[in-house]
Every structure is written in structure tokens, then in C-alpha cells.
Amino acid sequence: MSKLGVFLTICLLLFPLTALQLDGDQPADKPAQRKLKILPKRKHWTRFTCCYEEECPPSCKLCC
């Protein structure tokens, strides 16, 4: 192996690319906050979908 290859291997072992931190303002760092902004507030929930303020079927559960 050439000297350059050995040098690059040592550098990658000492400073792996995964050790680099993301900026604090990137959305990947804050998935919970991003999720809260996407989901609207809902009052009633069914098993898989939500009921809104209109008439709820009996399968809805009150979540307040």
C-alpha cells in the first residue's frame, strides 16, 4: 500500500466521517419538534385515523 493510502486509512480511523456533528438548526436534529409543527391539533382519535370536530362515530376515543 502506498504512503498516501496508509495516511488516508489512519486519518479515517482517527477522524471518522460519522463523528462530524450536524448544525443545530438542521431538522434532522429535531424530529420531535418538526413532527409537532406538521400535525394539527386533534380532539378525537380512532385506531388509525382521526375524527375532527364534526360528529364522531362510536369508535372514536376522546383524548383530551
Curated annotation (Swiss-Prot):
Pfam families: Conotoxin. Disulfide bonds join C50-C64, C51-C60, C56-C63. It is found in: Secreted. Expressed by the venom duct. Keywords: Disulfide bond, Secreted, Signal, Toxin. GO terms for molecular function: ion channel inhibitor activity; toxin activity. The cysteine framework is III (CC-C-C-CC). This is Conotoxin reg3.16. It comes from Conus regius (Crown cone).
